[in-house]
Amino acid sequence: MLLEAAPVPDERTPLYVPRSWVAMAELGRAFVGRRTELGRIAAAMRHPDLSGAALIGEGGVGKSRLLTEAVRQVCRRHHFVVCAAACQATSSVPFGAFAQHLPPEFTGTAFNGGSLRLAADALIGRAGGRKPVLVIDDVHLLDPASLALAFQMARRHEAFVLAATHSAEAVPDPITGLWTSGMAEWIEVRPFSREEVGEVLEHALGGPAEGMLVQRCWEATGGKAFLLRELVAAMLETGTLAPADGVWRASGPFPVTLRLAGVVDRRLAGLGDDCRRVLELLAFGGPLSPDVPARLVSRPAVEAVEALGIVEVTRLGDREQARLTPSLYGEVLRARTPRLRARRVREELAAALEAGPHAREDLRRVVAWRLENGVRPPAESVVAAMRDAWAHLDHELSAELAAHAVAAGQGTRAAEPLGYGLMFLGRAREAEERLARLPRPAAERDRARLACVRAFNLAFGLDSVRAARALLHSALRDVAGVESRAEPAAVLALLDVATGRCRAGAGLAEKVMAEAPHDSRAHCVAEVARAVALAFLRPPEESFPALERAREPALRHQAELPWLEFFLELGWVHACLLTGDFPRAQARAAAAYDRAVERRFPFAIAWFCLLRALAARARGELREQLHRCREGVAIARELGNRGLLALLLGQLAHGLALSGQTAAAREALAEADEPAQRSLWLLQPWTELARSWVAAAGGSPGASAIAERAAALARESGAAGFESLALHEVARLGEPGHVLDRLGELAGRAGGDAAPQYAAHAAALVTGDGDALAASSAGLERLGSPLLAAEAAAEEANRHRAAGNLAAAAAAAARALRLAGPDGARTPALEALERPRLTRREREIAELAAAGMSSKEISLRFVLSVRTVENHLQRVYRKLGIGDRAELASLLDLFHPGSHPASGGDMNRAA
């Protein structure tokens, strides 16, 4: 038999449930954000003068879900909820929306004053003394009798009306009247923000989503909850969405399933041919000047689709742009357009743009459409389009157009878009092969630039530092002109800095800056290289101004050399980290990451994931560190970028070690070491510090010695700030006496606030002075590192406890637990923290008392006598060394079970 009947499943047969079904269910249940809206609903229900709240918003933004959550969180406990069934079918039946809540005789009852009073009394009677809440979705579909009933009960304060309607629909006059008379709150429900889309995805998928996936989903759906649910289901159903390295990622374009297409079809149902034609043009060509579809179709059609909210017209500078909103409609329309018709649409768009006034970016699209249709544009047009695509970070298109330019004999002009474009696409080996085959340029300047792009790709794409350096030296021998030599020399200076030779790199950069024209690319690259070197070598009063001066030239040349931003932000973040401004470091890294996500630039995202992870590490935000490492690892692995991958794996190992996942940490560190990266050796001390914490997590002896080797690496390169940080790690790992003198020396040399605080912490650890540890904790908190402050407070608590000062010990322990936060980092100091030894019942009673509950209320909660509760509290006071509830309230953090791992882990034996 070709087909066999499937066995009938019994109760023991596991049923396969598609992941898309699970995600759909989770997305349906997910409720994130909307705290403001829920708060306004709750406040309106408490307000004595208000009898209603109306939720207004576009279709699909989540008004119905908000109603459901409001009922669950706000209404259920103290109110009688009456859900109306407002729909087209009941809109002509008197009291039809409330039929299920009224006696049978009301169905079809004549609508008059008497029937309104009887219906209101029936609902009030069913409420059993509670105030009714009339919950009405799609209030514009209410039948007149039900609408009048809701309005009258609200006017008389007999019920609270909680209604929702589409912003495109006319809100019924009675509901509007409640608002204009000051009896109802008017609440606009907006689409999800990008951050909220990320929260929804994480909730539904059971793990974090990469930033670019969140950005794409937010742009595609416009933040509308309904479309987001359908899009995620389509991606899961087709396998487009899958986890990689602990983070959810999407591959390729969004899939268009029959279900997703049906959703869009229903939204566009009823549109005339002209309106559909406008949408088709925008699907293939958007954003477009609205004049283009107006010429090709008609202006009334363009105005009609804009009025329907399907097309959005915005102004960019002095130009208007029309685009589909949400953009997912364009994905669906393109996917469903037959091949020959799509070709005709592209040709019409190309001809229309060429015929009218157009901007430079229009040429890029025209060339792309022509090539997709199999038409070869003129070489000059291809080169111009290529450079524009490169400036807009469209690496796929710039590399494709560069290949066409090479075929047309324009290889010299195509070298940078070809080489950098392929490198950033994760095709660095192909980039080197194709660049190496290009004919030798005749002009010195062109030969120098070809050498620069090849060297950059060799170093930061293939991690072949020696080959990159040899190529740059060869270029310097090959060209004689000062300006031609300046650019390879500047890139060589940058390579020196990146590989940890900061002094040599800074010296070479200064020489280039002295010889090259101030507005040249060479001067800019050299200035960035010098600024990054100073971030590691000099105190903040020198490094920060240098970084600030490099910002303007880097922005000026960003279209040609987008990697300038990578190094400039690397310098900024490290300058902040090494001098003790941790919040600023985190803010800069996050802003750079957001820009990369908005540009959909994976290489840059991975780079800035590393910087975000380092900043999170400094602040002790373990979950954030792991999230950014996993996201960066997934991207770097896909791109095949060895240097970035190794550094990200090192930070991942560090985060895993601190979270107690020792085996996974060892595995990540082993992968980071095979083979060791070279192109970003400047950052290798971070990996060595990670190695020390992995050793500590496994209880291996000598963890502090590994951290000392990291400090030695930093010392060799002249990075006093980094050396100070690494020596402080030695102190944290249990050997403060070994590094105390050197930390004292660096406190006066490194600059900034970090080095003095590290030295003070080490000194307090050596002396064991509780007051000094308290001062150190406060100082470390001012740096912006709650974790370091928590460690000092934990050490203070143990010193006070050993001295018999129980009250001070309890206060310090509570502070340590509060500062450590919910991430549960496992460090020697925190694992050694001794909590007061309270029984389970003592802890429960103490927590309630600290939260403000009276002994009488506590006794009722546990069915105990008041005297028993007081006796428990007295024992708690004695164990904590305090005298009353007022002191107990300040120790609330002590009583949160699971706020930190139990003490006594392997790290206490690792130093």
Where are these regions (language model features)?
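Conserved adenine-nucleotide phosphate-binding loops and their immediately adjacent elements
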Residues: 2-3, 12-41, 100, 255-258, ...
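Helix-turn-helix DNA-binding segment
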Residues: 10, 814, 828-874, 878-911
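Alpha-helical sensor/transducer elements of the RecA-like P-loop NTPase core
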Residues: 18, 96, 118, 145, ...
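Short secondary-structure boundary elements
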Residues: 21, 61, 196, 200-204, ...
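Extended alpha-helical scaffolding segments used for macromolecular assembly and cargo binding
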Residues: 52, 66-70, 74, 99-100, ...
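Conserved phosphate-binding/catalytic loops and adjacent sensor/switch elements of nucleotide-binding enzymes
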Residues: 61, 65-132, 141, 254
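Internal alpha-solenoid helical repeat scaffolds
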Residues: 67, 71-77, 140, 178-179, ...
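Alpha-solenoid helical repeat architecture
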Residues: 93, 319-321, 359-364, 397, ...
